[in-house]
Amino acid sequence: MSKRDYYEVLGVSKSASKDEIKKAYRRLAKKYHPDVSKEENAVEKFKEVQEAYEVLSDEQKRAQYDQFGHAGSSQGFGGGDFGGGFGFEDIFSSFFGGGSRRRDPNAPRQGADLQYQVTLEFEEAIFGKELNVEIPVEDPCDTCHGSGAKPGTTKETCKYCSGTGQISVEQNTPFGRIVNRQTCRHCSGTGQMIKEKCTTCHGTGKVRKRKKINVKIPAGIDNGQQIRVAGKGEAGVNGGPAGDLYVVVHVREHEFFERDGDHIICEMPLTFAQAALGAEVEVPTVHGKVKLKIPAGTQTGTEFRLKGKGAPNVRGYGQGDQYVVVRVVVPTNLTAHQKELLREFAGQEDKDDSLFGKLKRAFKGE
């Protein structure tokens, strides 16, 4: 089943402000919260609302979603925490009296996402490229297989929090006794303690290493876009899945080509004679040189379209065009004969063929 549009999920317009999106999210999250809602598919709807908010609350993710739809939003952007800054715990706290639901400290958790910057030449971005990148990651320790405990030993349940990862702290206040729950400092909230630590990773369960990863850059990618490589981020916690790697692409400027989405733009200088009398010229494209007929009387700023000579759409939706913008170069070092002909040209209102012929031969050195 295809995903619903994120704006439709939250019930907001595509021009909605951040505050409108946040209000819609809070309202729907409260409505479909599994602990409150009695609707049969409340869990699925709650997850759908969470996913929509995660994308639309982030400016970069939202811009990419607006451009590419669900295919673009799945690529992600940035490193570290990719959440929208207002998650499940915020909702639970604001709606249900400030006390967040206790999570299993030993439950599997996904590893952190990583970001890698890569710079491509203009043509490499047009045609795509396969790269082998080397990134620093934290992988599970091979010695203890990620447990952090010395081989042959096991973790023990924390005696201070009885494996809950939290301890209760009582406080007497003018309003009575208040019990607060805090993260257990003895086990750092894991609920387990390592009596004999692994000597390789010193009890962390992870080791820092450099990993080589093959990344396929799709043809037509543009400056600032990114590729998501699933499962190539940091190792998961407690057996959870690894995070993702996001490769952010930067494209070097070209000497005379410019990108405008899938289209390529270049400026074509023409001599006075070529522009006035017409000519056939060779135009460079990323696909090779092509011949272009310039009609007589072409002016600076005139634009010619070379169909299919642009960049391929990164999502596979066709091919862009190349636009050639004319710039007429006014001659600066004229011979006496050329000056004489131009004066004759300026003085004649009827620009007859014989004068055009003289001008053409003069400017071509014939």
UniProtKB/Swiss-Prot annotation:
Cofactor dependence: Zn(2+)
Annotated GO MF terms: ATP binding; heat shock protein binding; unfolded protein binding; zinc ion binding
SUPFAM superfamilies: Chaperone J-domain (SSF46565), DnaJ/Hsp40 cysteine-rich domain (SSF57938), HSP40/DnaJ peptide-binding domain (SSF49493)
Residues annotated for Zn(2+) 2 binding in this entry: C158, C161, C184, C187
One Gene Ontology CC term in the entry: cytoplasm
Domain J per the UniProt entry, residue ranges: 5-69
Protein location: Cytoplasm
InterPro entries: DnaJ, DnaJ_C, DnaJ_domain, DnaJ_domain_CS, HSP40/DnaJ_pept-bd, HSP_DnaJ_Cys-rich_dom, HSP_DnaJ_Cys-rich_dom_sf, J_dom_sf
Entry binding sites for Zn(2+) 1: C141, C144, C198, C201
Domain notes: The J domain is necessary and sufficient to stimulate DnaK ATPase activity. Zinc center 1 plays an important role in the autonomous, DnaK-independent chaperone activity of DnaJ. Zinc center 2 is essential for interaction with DnaK and for DnaJ activity.
Known partners and oligomeric status: Homodimer.
Family designation: Belongs to the DnaJ family.
Name of the protein in question: Chaperone protein DnaJ
Gene: dnaJ
